[in-house]
Amino acid sequence: MAIPSYKVRLETNEPITPNVRKLVFRLEDPKTITYKQGQFVSFMLGTEDGRPIKRSYSIANMETDGVDSTYIEFVISYVEGGKASELFFNAEPGKEMEMTGPFGLLCLTEELPKRVFLVGTGTGVAPYRSMIEQMRTRTDTEFHILFGAQYLEDMFYLDDFKAVALLDHVHFHPCLSREEKPGCFSGYVQHKLAELNPNPETDIAYLCGNPNMVDEVFEMLKDKDFGVKQVKREKYVFSRF
Protein backbone atom coordinates (compact mmCIF):
# COMPACT_ATOMS: atom_id res chain seq x y z
CA MET A 1 0.00 0.00 0.00
CA ALA A 2 1.43 3.36 -1.07
CA ILE A 3 2.22 5.89 1.65
CA PRO A 4 -0.04 8.95 1.28
CA SER A 5 1.87 11.98 0.00
CA TYR A 6 0.79 15.61 0.20
CA LYS A 7 1.93 18.89 -1.27
CA VAL A 8 1.78 21.54 1.44
CA ARG A 9 2.41 25.27 1.63
CA LEU A 10 3.80 27.04 4.70
CA GLU A 11 1.20 29.47 6.05
CA THR A 12 2.81 30.73 9.27
CA ASN A 13 6.17 30.33 11.00
CA GLU A 14 6.42 31.99 14.40
CA PRO A 15 8.62 31.72 17.51
CA ILE A 16 6.78 30.54 20.63
CA THR A 17 9.83 30.20 22.92
CA PRO A 18 13.47 31.29 22.49
CA ASN A 19 14.23 27.86 20.99
CA VAL A 20 10.94 26.60 19.52
CA ARG A 21 8.93 27.66 16.50
CA LYS A 22 5.36 26.80 15.56
CA LEU A 23 4.71 26.09 11.88
CA VAL A 24 1.35 25.75 10.14
CA PHE A 25 1.20 24.14 6.71
CA ARG A 26 -1.88 24.32 4.47
CA LEU A 27 -2.72 21.22 2.43
CA GLU A 28 -2.51 21.96 -1.31
CA ASP A 29 -2.80 18.58 -3.07
CA PRO A 30 -4.79 16.77 -1.87
CA LYS A 31 -6.63 19.44 0.09
CA THR A 32 -7.28 17.44 3.27
CA ILE A 33 -5.68 14.83 5.50
CA THR A 34 -7.22 12.36 7.94
CA TYR A 35 -5.22 11.45 11.03
CA LYS A 36 -5.57 10.21 14.59
CA GLN A 37 -4.65 12.50 17.47
CA GLY A 38 -1.13 11.55 18.57
CA GLN A 39 0.18 10.68 15.12
CA PHE A 40 3.02 12.36 13.20
CA VAL A 41 3.89 13.35 9.64
CA SER A 42 7.19 13.27 7.78
CA PHE A 43 8.83 15.79 5.46
CA MET A 44 11.29 15.03 2.69
CA LEU A 45 13.89 17.77 2.77
CA GLY A 46 16.41 18.66 0.09
CA THR A 47 19.85 19.67 1.36
CA GLU A 48 22.66 21.69 -0.15
CA ASP A 49 24.59 18.59 -1.20
CA GLY A 50 21.50 17.22 -2.94
CA ARG A 51 20.88 14.33 -0.56
CA PRO A 52 17.26 14.17 0.63
CA ILE A 53 16.66 13.71 4.35
CA LYS A 54 13.45 12.83 6.18
CA ARG A 55 12.27 14.45 9.39
CA SER A 56 9.14 13.61 11.38
CA TYR A 57 7.03 15.89 13.58
CA SER A 58 4.02 15.21 15.79
CA ILE A 59 0.75 16.76 14.72
CA ALA A 60 -0.24 19.48 17.20
CA ASN A 61 -3.61 20.43 15.69
CA MET A 62 -6.29 20.95 18.33
CA GLU A 63 -9.48 19.75 16.67
CA THR A 64 -12.52 17.73 17.72
CA ASP A 65 -11.43 15.03 15.29
CA GLY A 66 -8.73 14.49 12.70
CA VAL A 67 -11.03 13.94 9.74
CA ASP A 68 -10.54 16.04 6.63
CA SER A 69 -8.22 18.58 8.22
CA THR A 70 -7.03 21.27 5.82
CA TYR A 71 -3.84 22.13 7.72
CA ILE A 72 -1.07 20.62 9.84
CA GLU A 73 0.47 22.40 12.83
CA PHE A 74 3.68 21.25 14.50
CA VAL A 75 6.47 22.60 16.68
CA ILE A 76 10.21 22.23 16.19
CA SER A 77 13.18 22.81 18.49
CA TYR A 78 16.33 24.45 17.20
CA VAL A 79 19.37 22.17 16.94
CA GLU A 80 22.60 24.07 16.36
CA GLY A 81 24.01 22.96 13.03
CA GLY A 82 20.96 20.82 12.31
CA LYS A 83 20.03 21.05 8.64
CA ALA A 84 16.33 20.40 9.23
CA SER A 85 15.94 22.99 11.98
CA GLU A 86 17.91 25.54 9.95
CA LEU A 87 15.59 24.94 7.02
CA PHE A 88 12.37 25.18 9.02
CA PHE A 89 13.47 28.06 11.26
CA ASN A 90 14.31 30.15 8.18
CA ALA A 91 11.43 29.04 5.96
CA GLU A 92 9.26 31.87 4.66
CA PRO A 93 5.46 31.66 4.32
CA GLY A 94 4.57 30.38 0.87
CA LYS A 95 7.30 27.75 0.80
CA GLU A 96 6.07 24.51 -0.76
CA MET A 97 7.12 21.12 0.57
CA GLU A 98 6.26 17.43 0.35
CA MET A 99 4.74 15.68 3.36
CA THR A 100 3.87 12.02 3.97
CA GLY A 101 1.80 10.30 6.63
CA PRO A 102 0.17 10.11 9.02
CA PHE A 103 2.18 7.59 11.02
CA GLY A 104 2.43 6.42 14.62
CA LEU A 105 0.50 4.64 17.36
CA LEU A 106 0.80 7.15 20.22
CA CYS A 107 -2.99 7.50 20.27
CA LEU A 108 -5.66 7.21 22.94
CA THR A 109 -7.32 3.81 22.79
CA GLU A 110 -11.05 3.21 22.54
CA GLU A 111 -11.16 1.84 26.08
CA LEU A 112 -9.18 3.69 28.72
CA PRO A 113 -8.42 2.76 32.34
CA LYS A 114 -9.02 4.83 35.45
CA ARG A 115 -5.96 7.06 34.98
CA VAL A 116 -3.85 8.07 31.97
CA PHE A 117 -0.47 9.76 32.38
CA LEU A 118 0.70 11.86 29.42
CA VAL A 119 4.38 12.55 30.04
CA GLY A 120 6.36 14.79 27.70
CA THR A 121 9.46 16.96 27.57
CA GLY A 122 9.97 19.90 25.21
CA THR A 123 8.20 19.45 21.89
CA GLY A 124 7.20 15.98 23.08
CA VAL A 125 3.98 17.51 24.44
CA ALA A 126 2.75 18.28 20.91
CA PRO A 127 0.76 15.03 20.53
CA TYR A 128 -0.92 15.66 23.89
CA ARG A 129 -2.12 19.04 22.70
CA SER A 130 -3.82 17.29 19.79
CA MET A 131 -5.61 15.04 22.31
CA ILE A 132 -7.13 17.91 24.30
CA GLU A 133 -10.57 17.74 22.71
CA GLN A 134 -10.63 13.98 23.31
CA MET A 135 -9.74 14.53 26.95
CA ARG A 136 -12.64 16.93 27.34
CA THR A 137 -15.18 14.28 26.40
CA ARG A 138 -13.63 11.20 28.08
CA THR A 139 -14.87 12.11 31.52
CA ASP A 140 -14.68 8.58 32.94
CA THR A 141 -10.88 8.73 32.81
CA GLU A 142 -8.58 10.91 34.92
CA PHE A 143 -5.86 12.50 32.77
CA HIS A 144 -2.55 13.79 34.11
CA ILE A 145 -0.46 15.89 31.68
CA LEU A 146 3.18 16.20 32.79
CA PHE A 147 5.18 18.80 30.83
CA GLY A 148 8.91 18.92 31.53
CA ALA A 149 11.28 21.77 30.64
CA GLN A 150 14.34 23.46 32.08
CA TYR A 151 12.80 26.93 32.43
CA LEU A 152 9.31 28.39 32.29
CA GLU A 153 10.25 30.36 29.19
CA ASP A 154 10.82 27.03 27.41
CA MET A 155 7.16 26.04 27.78
CA PHE A 156 4.41 26.61 25.21
CA TYR A 157 0.73 25.77 24.67
CA LEU A 158 0.32 26.58 28.37
CA ASP A 159 -3.03 28.31 27.89
CA ASP A 160 -4.42 25.24 26.14
CA PHE A 161 -3.26 22.81 28.81
CA LYS A 162 -4.38 25.07 31.67
CA ALA A 163 -7.80 25.52 30.06
CA VAL A 164 -8.52 21.81 29.76
CA ALA A 165 -7.19 21.29 33.30
CA LEU A 166 -10.10 23.38 34.59
CA LEU A 167 -12.14 20.21 34.12
CA ASP A 168 -12.37 18.01 37.20
CA HIS A 169 -10.96 14.94 35.44
CA VAL A 170 -7.92 16.62 33.83
CA HIS A 171 -4.77 17.72 35.68
CA PHE A 172 -1.79 19.66 34.34
CA HIS A 173 1.65 19.41 35.98
CA PRO A 174 4.31 21.77 34.56
CA CYS A 175 7.72 20.58 35.80
CA LEU A 176 10.85 22.77 35.78
CA SER A 177 14.29 21.24 36.30
CA ARG A 178 16.39 24.43 36.46
CA GLU A 179 14.28 27.00 38.32
CA GLU A 180 11.43 27.41 40.78
CA LYS A 181 8.22 29.13 39.74
CA PRO A 182 4.81 29.41 41.43
CA GLY A 183 2.42 26.73 40.24
CA CYS A 184 5.20 24.53 38.85
CA PHE A 185 6.78 21.39 40.23
CA SER A 186 10.53 21.79 40.83
CA GLY A 187 12.25 18.75 39.34
CA TYR A 188 11.99 16.30 36.48
CA VAL A 189 8.76 14.84 35.14
CA GLN A 190 9.78 11.39 36.36
CA HIS A 191 9.94 12.71 39.93
CA LYS A 192 6.46 14.21 39.66
CA LEU A 193 5.14 11.00 38.13
CA ALA A 194 6.54 9.01 41.06
CA GLU A 195 4.66 11.34 43.44
CA LEU A 196 1.41 10.47 41.66
CA ASN A 197 2.02 6.80 42.45
CA PRO A 198 1.16 5.13 39.12
CA ASN A 199 -0.59 1.79 39.56
CA PRO A 200 -0.44 -0.96 36.90
CA GLU A 201 -3.85 -2.20 38.00
CA THR A 202 -5.60 1.05 37.07
CA ASP A 203 -3.29 3.21 34.93
CA ILE A 204 -1.47 3.49 31.60
CA ALA A 205 1.25 5.93 30.53
CA TYR A 206 2.26 7.72 27.35
CA LEU A 207 5.87 8.91 27.07
CA CYS A 208 7.14 11.31 24.42
CA GLY A 209 10.23 13.47 23.98
CA ASN A 210 13.80 13.21 25.23
CA PRO A 211 15.05 9.61 24.84
CA ASN A 212 16.74 9.62 28.26
CA MET A 213 13.49 10.66 29.93
CA VAL A 214 11.51 8.05 28.01
CA ASP A 215 13.94 5.29 29.00
CA GLU A 216 14.13 6.36 32.64
CA VAL A 217 10.36 6.59 33.08
CA PHE A 218 9.86 3.29 31.28
CA GLU A 219 12.29 1.57 33.64
CA MET A 220 10.57 3.14 36.64
CA LEU A 221 7.19 1.89 35.45
CA LYS A 222 8.55 -1.59 34.73
CA ASP A 223 9.81 -1.67 38.33
CA LYS A 224 6.22 -0.98 39.36
CA ASP A 225 5.08 -4.00 37.29
CA PHE A 226 3.72 -2.07 34.31
CA GLY A 227 3.63 -4.26 31.21
CA VAL A 228 4.95 -3.17 27.81
CA LYS A 229 1.40 -2.68 26.49
CA GLN A 230 0.62 -0.32 29.38
CA VAL A 231 3.35 2.14 28.34
CA LYS A 232 3.26 3.78 24.91
CA ARG A 233 6.57 5.40 23.94
CA GLU A 234 7.84 7.77 21.28
CA LYS A 235 11.40 9.11 21.40
CA TYR A 236 12.47 12.37 19.76
CA VAL A 237 16.00 12.09 18.40
CA PHE A 238 17.61 15.42 17.52
CA SER A 239 19.92 15.12 14.52
CA ARG A 240 22.44 17.57 13.11
CA PHE A 241 22.04 16.08 9.65
Where are these regions (language model features)?
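Reductase modules of NAD(P)H-dependent flavoproteins
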Residues: 2-7, 142, 146-241
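Ferredoxin-reductase
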Residues: 2-93
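A short, basic/flexible loop-to-alpha-helix module at the beginning of a structural domain
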Residues: 101-112
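Conserved S-adenosyl-L-methionine
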Residues: 113, 136-143
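Conserved beta-strand elements of the Class I
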Residues: 117-119, 206
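Ser/Thr-glycine-rich phosphate-binding loops at phosphate-binding pockets of nucleotides
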Residues: 121-125
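Histidine-anchored nucleotide/phosphate-binding helix
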Residues: 127-136
